[in-house]
Regions:
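Acidic, metal/ion-coordinating pockets
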Residues: 1-198
Length: 198
């Protein structure tokens, strides 16, 4: 199975780039499942129902979020109502939405978990992502997930690496988002988990 993970899509120009190249890329590479971080898919920052709809129309199966997920009030009802639009699961307080979904593809099922880091992200209250990850992995297994993907939206490489090593062998892959900088450290960790920092 081929899973495509796309880091932060930024603004209308980022959405336009996705619209232009994603359908052809999915066809060329025979992509089975696509996760896009859309927390900045609206100009400025945040996500709106319109930007999410465009990302789904281009081929996203799940849209994840981050520290800007709650920036636009127009997103709140979408986060509550659309099962496949996520915000970080470990946001504290009464945040709209959820940070986990399970996609049944017929031949397999894919759980997507969205978590927020805490290092250098002190403007957003988030609980311990390690504890949240353990709880949601347990839920994913109980739900029958065959594949578990984590989008860890975090600033510090050290925090991303730490969670990657902690979850090695417990999940299929962890991809980092937030920094808007591609890294060249994609790897399979010792116990079989795919990992990349961005």
């Amino acid at each position: 199975m081929k899973i495509l993970a796309i880091g932060d899509v930024c603004g209308s120009l980022g959405c336009e780039a996705v619209r232009k190249w994603l359908p052809a890329l999915k066809k060329e590479k025979k992509i089975d499942f696509t996760v896009i971080n859309g927390e900045n898919s609206t100009d400025g920052n945040g996500i709106t129902p319109e930007s999410a709809e465009m990302l789904f129309a281009c081929g996203a199966d799940v849209i994840t979020g981050g520290n800007h997920s709650m920036r636009r009030k127009s997103a709140y009802s979408m986060l509550d109502e659309n099962y496949f639009v996520l915000r970080p699961a470990n946001l504290e307080g009464d945040a709209a939405g959820k940070g986990y979904c399970l996609a049944d593809l017929g031949y397999t099922s894919v759980a997507v978990i969205n978590l927020l880091g805490r290092v250098y992200l002190d403007r957003v209250a988030a609980s311990n992502p390690f504890i949240a990850a353990d709880e949601l992995i347990q839920k994913a297994r109980a739900d029958g997930a065959k594949i578990i993907i984590v989008d860890f939206h975090a600033e510090a490489t050290s925090e991303k690496r730490a969670l990657g090593f902690y979850l090695d062998g417990k999940i299929s892959a962890l991809f980092g988002t937030h920094t808007h900088v591609q890294t060249a450290d994609s790897q399979i960790l010792k116990n079989g988990t795919g990992y990349i920092t961005p």
